C-alpha cells in the first residue's frame, strides 16, 4: 500500500477547546485517513506543525519513527502561523523570510523522504470579523503569503493544492471559530486533499 505523509498546522492536526478563541476543531487529517482507508496509509506529523521555521526545526525528529524512505506523497502546508499578527505586531514571519523558509523546508523534505512526490497546500481564509485582536490575520495578507508560496513552488516544480479558493466558498457552518474548521469543513478539505494526493500517486 502507498504511504502519504501530511504536514500542517492545526487546520490539519486539530485544535482542542483550550481558549475563548478556539471552540474545538477535529482537523482534516483524520478524515483524509478515513477517505483513503484501504487505499493508502496516511501518516502525519505528531504535532501542530505551526510556522515554516518550526517545521524546519522539527521535521527530522517527526520522521524518525516512520518509514521515511517509503513515503510516496508529502502533502504540506505552512502559512497561517507565518501570517499571524500577535499583540499588534507585524506578521510572525516576514514574507521574504517565509519564502526562504519554504525553500529550506522543501529541501529538508527531499532529504528525509527522497522518494516522495511533494504537494504544497495554500493556507485557508479566516473569518476576519471574529478574529481576536491579540491573534489576528487578514485575508489580504494570507493571499499575499499564498502568492509568494505559489511563486516558490513554481520555481521548485511543486504542484499546489488550492485550499484557499475551496474554503473561500464556505459559510460559517464550515468553521469552528474564526480560523479553524468544523467537522463539516474538515471533511470538505479532506475530500480535496485525498483527491489531490491520489492524483499525485497516479501521476
For the regions a protein language model found, what residue spans apply to each?
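Generic structural signal for well-ordered alpha-helices
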Residues: 59, 102-106, 146, 150
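Cell-envelope and extracellular/periplasmic
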Residues: 6-11, 36, 44-51, 72-93, ...
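Charged helix-capping and loop-helix junction motifs
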Residues: 91-103, 141-146
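Glycine-rich phosphate-binding loop signature in dinucleotide/nucleotide-binding domains
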Residues: 65-70, 112-113, 200
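Catalytic His-Asp segment of secreted/periplasmic serine-dependent ester chemistry enzymes
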Residues: 123-203
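Serine-esterase "nucleophile elbow" of acetyl-processing enzymes
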Residues: 1-48, 53, 61-69, 74, ...
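Conserved beta-strand segments of alpha/beta enzyme cores
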Residues: 41-43, 117, 157-159
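Active-site segments of SGNH/GDSL-like serine hydrolases
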Residues: 77-83, 106-143
